[in-house]
């Protein structure tokens, strides 16, 4: 498996990316997670690189079209169920990053919509399981903040979310 951006600095050409993927394939990679944004290695901070270079989903779609034998997973700026549905028409999978970190409960909503699951856990049930996990980990010496800092978004957009974050 390899994860890469579609280009860097002044290089965002289909042939360059396709050749790079072929080299990785020849080395044994079968799954490629393609972030649909090039990386600006000079002039932008890592934080700026999260938003400033434009997303180019079509290049990822074209890579899949030219390489149907490879598993191509698209990544970059994806946060809504309709976006996921659309990308799945052209790619084998979707990787969601920041939006899941900001609102982890959206994974339950995505699972319900995409996979038609039933009996999905409520936020409260997720919080209860989290507390059980936290209790076990604290007994093993894990610091509370090492876990809790990744869960502040569990009640994202809900009444009382500020209390959860505290």
Predicted regions and their residues:
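Alpha/beta catalytic cores of nucleotide-metabolism and tRNA/nucleoside-modifying enzymes
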Residues: 8-10, 14-22, 27-31, 55-74, ...
């Amino acid at each position: 498996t390899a994860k890469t951006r579609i280009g860097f600095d002044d290089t965002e050409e289909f042939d360059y990316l396709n050749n790079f993927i072929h080299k990785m394939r020849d080395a044994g990679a079968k799954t490629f997670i393609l972030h649909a944004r090039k990386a600006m290695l000079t002039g932008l901070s890592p934080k700026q690189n999260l938003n400033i270079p434009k997303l180019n989903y079509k290049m990822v779609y074209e890579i899949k079209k030219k390489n149907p034998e490879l598993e191509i997973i698209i990544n970059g700026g994806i946060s809504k169920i309709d976006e996921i549905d659309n990308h799945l028409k052209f790619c084998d999978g979707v990787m969601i990053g920041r939006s899941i970190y900001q609102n982890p409960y959206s994974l339950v909503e995505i699972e319900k919509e995409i996979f038609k699951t039933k009996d999905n856990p409520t936020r409260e049930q997720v919080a209860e399981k989290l507390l059980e996990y936290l209790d076990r980990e604290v007994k093993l010496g894990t610091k509370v903040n090492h876990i809790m800092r990744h869960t502040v978004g569990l009640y994202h957009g809900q009444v009382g979310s500020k209390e959860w974050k505290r």
